[in-house]
């Protein structure tokens, strides 16, 4: 690792710590004595997304997160839910062991998870992903969602009934 201050190629590691997705190392240059931090992360083999027009684009988790955040914007979702969905999708893609995946597979994976997470986010994403040309196509998706809904409320959805009518409250004893 070259020193960022004097560009000398040698440095010694003073401290190493595990961080979320790699190793953080504190280093000291053997020539100028300046200290700096480096991060080492595992970088999996390249994964490419094959677009509808057959272009190939390297998989970008940030682009996936951006689309998810746009669909989930201003929705009452638990903190970290969108990041977890993106992480789960990324892990599943890499676990497939393929070098290329079609963009339709990626889109379907997002749709599947958004449908479980939040109906409004699902419809928002579907309206862009499915490229609706008129309101009747959107209405059909919403009708299918309403008619096919098993539980009435998906995780992350707000109840229409006040909480005291939906579930009887119980008193808890203080410890």
Swiss-Prot record:
Note accompanying the cofactor annotation: Binds 1 zinc ion.
Keywords of this entry: ATP-binding, DNA-binding, Metal-binding, Nucleotide-binding, Repressor, Transcription, Transcription regulation, Zinc, Zinc-finger
Superkingdom of origin organism: Bacteria
InterPro entries given in the database record: ATP-cone_dom (IPR005144), NrdR-like_N (IPR055173), RNR_NrdR-like (IPR003796)
Residues covered by the ATP-cone domain: 47-137
GO terms, biological process: negative regulation of DNA-templated transcription
Keyword Zinc: yes
Zn finger limits (unnamed): 3-32
UniProt cross-references to HAMAP family, sorted A to Z: NrdR
Family, per entry: Belongs to the NrdR family.
Full protein name: Transcriptional repressor NrdR
Organism in which the protein naturally occurs: Dehalococcoides mccartyi (strain CBDB1)
Organism ancestry: Bacteria, Bacillati, Chloroflexota, Dehalococcoidia, Dehalococcoidales
Gene: nrdR
């Amino acid at each position: 690792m070259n020193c960022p201050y004097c560009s000398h190629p040698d440095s010694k590691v003073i401290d190493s710590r595990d961080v979320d997705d790699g190793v953080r190392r504190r280093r000291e240059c053997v020539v100028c004595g300046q200290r700096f931090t480096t991060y080492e992360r595992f970088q999996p083999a390249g994964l490419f997304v094959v677009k509808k027009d057959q272009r190939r684009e390297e998989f970008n988790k940030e682009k996936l997160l951006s689309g998810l955040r746009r669909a989930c914007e201003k929705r009452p979702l638990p903190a970290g839910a969108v990041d977890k969905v993106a992480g789960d999708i990324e892990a599943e893609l890499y676990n497939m062991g393929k070098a290329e995946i079609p963009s339709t597979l990626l889109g379907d994976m997002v749709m599947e998870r958004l449908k479980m997470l939040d109906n409004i986010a699902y419809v928002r994403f579907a309206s862009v992903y499915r490229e609706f040309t008129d309101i009747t196509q959107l209405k059909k998706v919403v009708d299918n969602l309403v008619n096919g809904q098993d539980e009435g409320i998906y995780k992350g959805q707000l109840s229409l009934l006040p909480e005291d009518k939906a579930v009887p409250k119980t008193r808890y004893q203080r410890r």
